[in-house]
Swiss-Prot record:
Protein name: Queuine tRNA-ribosyltransferase
Subunit structure: Homodimer. Within each dimer, one monomer is responsible for RNA recognition and catalysis, while the other monomer binds to the replacement base PreQ1.
Keyword Signal annotated: no
Purpose: Catalyzes the base-exchange of a guanine (G) residue with the queuine precursor 7-aminomethyl-7-deazaguanine (PreQ1) at position 34 (anticodon wobble position) in tRNAs with GU(N) anticodons (tRNA-Asp, -Asn, -His and -Tyr). Catalysis occurs through a double-displacement mechanism. The nucleophile active site attacks the C1' of nucleotide 34 to detach the guanine base from the RNA, forming a covalent enzyme-RNA intermediate. The proton acceptor active site deprotonates the incoming PreQ1, allowing a nucleophilic attack on the C1' of the ribose to form the product.
Broad EC category: transferase
Statement: the UniProt record of this protein carries the keyword Ribosomal protein: no
Pathway involvement of the protein, from the record: tRNA modification; tRNA-queuosine biosynthesis
GO molecular function list: metal ion binding; tRNA-guanosine(34) queuine transglycosylase activity
Domain of life: Bacteria
Amino acids binding substrate: D95, S96, G97, G98, F99, D149, Q191, G218
GO cellular component: cytosol
Species this chain originates from: Nostoc sp. (strain PCC 7120 / SAG 25.82 / UTEX 2576)
Residues at the active site: D95 (proton acceptor), D268 (nucleophile)
Gene name in the database record: tgt
UniProt keyword terms in alphabetical order: Glycosyltransferase, Metal-binding, Queuosine biosynthesis, Transferase, tRNA processing, Zinc
Amino acid sequence: MSAIFSFQSLARCSQTKARSGIFLTPHGIVETPRFMPVGTLANVKTVTPAQLKETGAQMVLSNTYHLHLQPGEAIVAGGGGLHKFMGWNGPMLTDSGGFQVFSLSEMRKITEEGVTFRSPRDGQIIKLTPERSIEIQNILGADVIMAFDECPPYPANRQEVEAATERTYRWLERCITAHQRQDQALFGIVQGGVYLDLRAKAANTLTELDLPGYAIGGVSVGEPPEMMAQIVQATAPLLPAHKPRYLMGVGTYREMVIAIASGIDLFDCVIPTRWARHGTAMVKGERWNLKNAKFREDFAPIDETCPCYACQNFSRAYISHLVRSQEILAYTLLSIHNITELIRFTQKIREAILSDRFLEEFGHWLNSAETDNR
């Protein structure tokens, strides 16, 4: 790992593989385990950078594919790079665009060279290769960048998944060659679908390349929750203990606890802001629909114990009114609360690991279904 990047494990759970640590980047530290809010188009929807900082967010994710389409990496560079362009001075990560491209199943063609697809914005034909993905990410300037990978769908047969996994490795080698900036850490991505032996082979092969960090991709794409848990539990321990481990696209309470127990450090997910835009609050493991009639005259805060701006200043009744009226402020307040909730959740897990009380305080999540909606 470059001298400007480092990962230090501070404590480990004595009964699981959970760990707490510090990931150092050029734009500051990330205390792990940590949830990362998603700012797809260089903004976390409905939330300003100042508000985002108050949630406790330390690292934010943006999307290479979407930023390439709009406004274009040249515009971002002209604005001083991604951090300055969006007004966020903390650590940042950009994904490679692979997941988004491969979700365009009817609009793209895969070859060894890369992926050709038709832009959903204007119909323009775009070619994205490992080299082009890295070039765009180098221009954007995030602290952590991701290798361009092929994300197989679920379900997919073994032959298809094996071919995608092997291509992902070859593309990673090309990404490493193309990568030009020492102030950016390139993470590799372990694919392999639901086939644990393919996951193990990919993890062992990737770790030989001694990258600054590693991610588990291709999960939360439609497979049953218990299958995702098996993938993470089998794969995470195979990744180097002295490097950060990132589980892509995961952000529910139970999923994060299972992953942390397996040794995962970082998470990202659009759930807190997406649910907010549907009038849903995340509260201590539950999902509350603020449209429900019972909240219309409920003048308590969403969560009396939450320090966020929404809970310190507004009632459930008021936010319910905003949701019913489709006021933008509703989405802002719920996004602030939901992001704060997930970050506080991972902070509490971190503290429990430091005191070796992880299993005592969070073990019930490992054996139970997601809590029912209130």
